[in-house]
Amino acid sequence: MTKTLPEDFIFGGATAAYQAEGATNTDGKGRVAWDTYLEENYWYTAEPASDFYNRYPVDLELSEKFGVNGIRISIAWSRIFPNGYGEVNPKGVEYYHKLFAECHKRHVEPFVTLHHFDTPEVLHKDGDFLNRKTIDYFVDYAEYCFKEFPEVKYWTTFNEIGPIGDGQYLVGKFPPGIKYDFEKVFQSHHNMMVAHARAVKLFKDGGYKGEIGVVHALPTKYPFDPSNPEDVRAAELEDIIHNKFILDATYLGKYSRETMEGVQHILSVNGGKLNITDEDYAILDAAKDLNDFLGINYYMSDWMRGYDGESEITHNATGDKGGSKYQLKGVGQREFDVDVPRTDWDWMIYPQGLYDQIMRVVKDYPNYHKIYITENGLGYKDEFIESEKTVHDDARIDYVRQHLNVIADAIIDGANVKGYFIWSLMDVFSWSNGYEKRYGLFYVDFETQERYPKKSAYWYKELAETKEIK
């Protein structure tokens, strides 16, 4: 039976400033840590990425033509405040006014994120969000944007607080490239949640029009053997690191007893302690019911086994299937040999995990209000067919179809899901995979910056028009 989605459902496309804009040092933009990190460690940079800084009218015209009625955009903090604080860069401000005006001209609603992995380099060098001064600077930046851009009706504070701490201090594939430091992981999570809560409270107290929320990446964690207590415990601990800790902070305004027991166990095995003050808890508590929506980014699930060895993570950056290893001291190890399809980058394709995660939020955090699926999509080595000027990305269509079907199921079962943003609108630069891993509805020739609709774009257009998942 063909499933349908609600009439007012947002069929969106997602982007991020650093992954799409290019123009990394144009018109007064300040540096971010990624600029130096990529130059020193990788064979690619974010220049020119998808040249969205100049090509946004083309991408928004395509959005309108193909039924995309929402777009996730992030403001580059260092385009507004080159040093993260102090002097404002007027050309950066002007750019975003023009961008939002073009969105509205094309009837594409902008959902605007204040921070998408791109803390200004000056602040990043000074400890990023481990330094509590950065919290103050972020809140000042947020307030400036709320005042300056009243044309924005949907704000999110952060994109993926979990993967920021994870990438910077656990896996070590984000600058500053530190591995297995759980104290920094949890402290980063916590401090960013305090920054989020302060910004949300400020938005509500200031009487700004519109809505505000946060985007969390929520990969679902399962025990490899549900009858094995060690596997069950490993899944619980992995869930605390990636999901429960930040969800508790968002919607409980504190950390539940089970969450803190798990955190203390991980820190007792690996070393370190958290600095959480009474004032922090008061800030979290004051904002817990003020979030208008939750953005869920979902790509994959993981299956966990018990593990008592040392930490070792091998990140698959090349797209050679089978190149991943992930085992954490005091937590568990991910089992990749499961009967579930996976991408070339070893990401497990499991739509049921999205359904389970949505319903977990509904059950455990009933003050969630509403949900947008703010990222979901398939990274692929797309093959451009020159004679047809397109890509036959049937695997992507199938992936999105399966995930939309479980979203429809979740809505039937009581979840208030209001929209879906495919990652990504057009092909963009990938943080740890460069330009080979493509996600877009529109193929980007990175040499010429020409855009070509893929087969998935035509499929998505029909979906947006009919609301039927075919």
Curated annotation (Swiss-Prot):
The protein's Enzyme Commission number: 3.2.1.85
GO biological-process terms attached to the record: carbohydrate catabolic process; lactose catabolic process via tagatose-6-phosphate
One of the record's GO cellular component terms: cytosol
Matches recorded under PROSITE patterns: GLYCOSYL_HYDROL_F1_1, GLYCOSYL_HYDROL_F1_2
PANTHER family the record matches: GLYCOSYL HYDROLASE, LP05116P
Pathway given in the UniProt record: Carbohydrate metabolism; lactose degradation; D-galactose 6-phosphate and beta-D-glucose from lactose 6-phosphate: step 1/1
Keyword Hydrolase in annotation: yes
Keyword DNA-binding appears in the UniProt entry: no
Record family assignment: Belongs to the glycosyl hydrolase 1 family.
Catalyzed reactions per annotation: a 6-phospho-beta-D-galactoside + H2O = D-galactose 6-phosphate + an alcohol
UniProt keyword terms in alphabetical order: Glycosidase, Hydrolase
Binding site for D-galactose 6-phosphate: 19, 116, 159-160, 297, 430-431, 437, 439
Name of the protein in question: 6-phospho-beta-galactosidase
NCBIfam families, A to Z: lacG (TIGR01233), PRK13511.1 (NF010036)
Active site: 160, 375
Protein's organism: Staphylococcus aureus (strain NCTC 8325 / PS 47)
InterPro entries associated with the record: 6P-beta-galactosidase (IPR005928), Glyco_hydro_1 (IPR001360), Glyco_hydro_1_AS (IPR018120), Glyco_hydro_1_N_CS (IPR033132), Glycoside_hydrolase_SF (IPR017853)
A GO molecular-function annotation: beta-glucosidase activity
Source superkingdom: Bacteria
